């Protein structure tokens, strides 16, 4: 199981479908996960540091976890079946709750816990976008990688990632 970082939310055209883009913390694979509009907004708002005047659903969940005296330890994306990703919220006291990856990531960002992906999921749905240079990865190269990936996302559909 490897740790991933949230790259951000992209929008697949022409369907206008949001895609959550994760990248291995210690690798070059990206994991695209198609998600709903409201979850995409929740993730984007948190990444941008926007504080809503009233708690959104994922803020409420964060607050409930704390109010009930528990702590979220990590988020795990654990499976991919027929194009659907599955995740678990891992709490203290060995409590595990199944959740959608989009909700799990939105909560993880708010709580500040790591996100992990099972190797089998990365092997099945991860995309390798190699660096153009073996030298130090510069900001320009990383931006170019993301731009190439955006172009790739524009050319694929969720059906391309369904298991055969």
Curated annotation (Swiss-Prot):
GO molecular function: nuclease activity
Domain of life from the UniProt record: Bacteria
UniProt xrefs under PANTHER family: VON HIPPEL-LINDAU DISEASE TUMOR SUPPRESSOR, VON HIPPEL-LINDAU PROTEIN
Cellular-component GO terms for this entry: peptidoglycan-based cell wall; plasma membrane
Pfam families: BFN_dom
Name this polypeptide is given: Uncharacterized protein Rv1829
Domain BFN per the UniProt entry, residue ranges: 1-129
Taxonomic path: Bacteria, Bacillati, Actinomycetota, Actinomycetes, Mycobacteriales
Cross-referenced InterPro entries: BFN_sf (IPR036104), Bi_nuclease_dom (IPR003729)
